Amino acid sequence: MGQLSVLGFIALGGAFGACSRYLISELCVMLLGRGFPYGTLTVNVVGSFIMGLLIAAFETELMVTDPWRQIIGLGFLGALTTFSTFSMDNVLLMQQGAFFKMGLNVLLNVVLSISAAWIGFQLLMRS
C-alpha cells in the first residue's frame, strides 16, 4: 500500500473523529453546562476505551488489517481524543483560580482514561 493510500485512510478516520469530538463536546455542554470540561473528559475516556478494544482486537487477530489500524487508531482516535485541549482546559481553570476543578480534571482524565483502556482491552482478551 502506498503512502498516499495510508494518508487517505488516516484522513478519513480523522474526519470522523474530529466531527465526533465536536458533537460529543457540544452535547456535554448542552447537558452539563460549561462549568467543567466534561466534553474533553468524555472524548478522552471514550477514546481510551475504544483504543483498549482495538489493541485487544489486534492481539487476538480479530481485526489486523492495516487500513483498519490506520482509520481507527491513527485517524479516528487521534482526532477524537485531545491532549492539547485537556492541557488548555487546565490552564484556563488555573487562570480562573479553580485549582480544585483543575486537580479534579487532571485526576479524572488520567484515572478514567487508563481504566477505560484497560477495561476495553480486558473485554476482548477474555472473550
From Swiss-Prot:
Entry membrane topology: Multi-pass membrane protein
Cystine bridges: none
Catalyzed reactions per annotation: fluoride(in) = fluoride(out)
Membrane-spanning ranges: 4-24, 38-58, 71-91, 104-124
Pfam families attached to this UniProt entry: CRCB
Regulation: Na(+) is not transported, but it plays an essential structural role and its presence is essential for fluoride channel function.
Keyword line: Cell inner membrane, Cell membrane, Ion channel, Ion transport, Membrane, Metal-binding, Sodium, Transmembrane, Transmembrane helix, Transport
GO cellular component terms given for this protein: plasma membrane
GO molecular function annotation: fluoride channel activity; metal ion binding
Biological process annotations from GO: cellular detoxification of fluoride
UniProt-annotated location(s): Cell inner membrane
Keyword Membrane: yes
Positions contributing to Na(+) binding: 78, 81
Listed InterPro entries: FluC
Family: Belongs to the fluoride channel Fluc/FEX (TC 1.A.43) family.
NCBIfam families: crcB (TIGR00494), PRK14200.1 (NF010796)
Its biological purpose: Fluoride-specific ion channel. Important for reducing fluoride concentration in the cell, thus reducing its toxicity.
Name of the featured protein: Fluoride-specific ion channel FluC
Organism per entry: Vibrio campbellii (strain ATCC BAA-1116)
Chain's gene name: fluC
